[in-house]
A protein has these predicted regions:
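N-terminal phosphate-binding caps/lids of nucleotide- and nucleic-acid-binding domains
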Residues: 1-174
Length: 175
């Protein structure tokens, strides 16, 4: 019998990510809902290999201020609620603060975002939950997510993904 032990934070994050990100369509759903919550009037979705190797979602919403970008990828980080009382009056599609951290835990993420007030946009890269780069860049108002290599660091999860054709159909249903 194995001894009971507390899991390390990296393992916890990968397990938790599986509850939010089951397949490419989960990412399309979560990021499209974020775009709608950000006031977007246009959302573009592109996928390759059924979303397994590449998903790009671009919107013209309010964007994320540069100083808030790294925090957006932390677990339980949200702009939608502040306290338990807010749960009684939710008017957004998302509010848990789980989507971005979960997506980043199991894929390679590049986000380009710009608010209307900013002169330049921000490019942020995070892979497997580890921050890689944050830099200023030219960008339109809104946010673009590029998700690459879904479940690259959790081979058991990647093995259970459906074929690209099924993944593409599932993503199409979410849009």
């Amino acid at each position: 019998m194995s001894k009971i032990q507390i899991l390390d934070p990296v393992t916890i994050d990968k397990i938790a990510a599986g509850e939010v990100v089951e397949r490419p369509a989960s990412i399309v759903k979560e990021l499209s809902e974020n775009a709608i919550d950000a006031g977007a009037t246009a959302v573009t979705v592109e996928i390759e290999e059924g979303g397994i190797s590449y998903i790009r979602i671009a919107d013209n919403g309010c964007g994320i201020p540069k100083e808030e970008v790294p925090s957006a990828f932390l677990r339980h980080s949200t702009s939608k609620i502040r306290s338990v009382d807010d749960l009684l009056h939710i008017h957004s599609l998302g509010f848990r603060g789980e989507a971005l951290s979960s997506i980043a835990a199991v894929s390679q993420v590049e986000m380009i975002t710009k608010t209307q007030e900013e002169t330049f946009g921000t490019r942020y890269r995070i892979s497997g939950g580890k921050e890689e780069d944050l830099e200023e860049t030219g960008a339109k108002d809104g946010t673009t997510f590029i998700i690459r290599q879904l479940f690259y660091n959790t081979p058991a999860r990647r093995k259970f993904l459906k074929t690209p054709k099924i993944g593409r159909a599932s993503c199409r249903e979410r849009v």
